[in-house]
Amino acid sequence: MRLFLMFNMLFNWFPQAEPLIVTVNQEQIEWQSVCGTSSTKTYMDYRMITNRDSQQYKYIQSRMEARNGLLYDTDGSIGVALGSWWGKIGSKWTVELSSGEVYDLVKIDEKADKHTINGCQHIGDGSVIEFVIDTQTVPNSWWGGNGLVWNGNFNNYHKFKGNIQRIGKKKTVEVELDVSEFFPNHIQYK
């Protein structure tokens, strides 16, 4: 027996408890200065994006789903048009309104720089956020007396009412976690 133990110790064949490390993706929010605080929130139908070669069109077709008039990404973010200040198509943001409502948004269309102030706020109507919607699935109660959804401004709907209070850029980072304590019988062989 003594020879067997010495042989195993020499060649390190005994099972050894090692940390069990897993890598997971974790979403983080980097809070930033607000480029515009407008309460105006306009909309456009996603069918207005017709260039099949554009990033916008491809993103919408591959990742967005229409539910009750809004377009949702696979993670639940609401599809919107934003200016160039907000980054590329697919950029994800968390927006908090002065009402306390918080929304996760994804940029699926871009407002032209010539129509915005510093790539942020629309020159004509002052909107920062423009919802990209599916007018064919909009609930009847959303149609205003003027024939527009929420009379042309999502701020007229209590859930989207308020000025932009703060914004956060969403990003995904890889994090390593030691999960050994959850698997006490885990043994790795060297």
Feature locations, PLM:
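Sec-dependent N-terminal signal peptides of Gram-positive bacterial secreted proteins and lipoproteins
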Residues: 1-16
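Solvent-exposed, well-ordered loop and adjacent helix/strand elements within mature globular domains
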Residues: 13-190
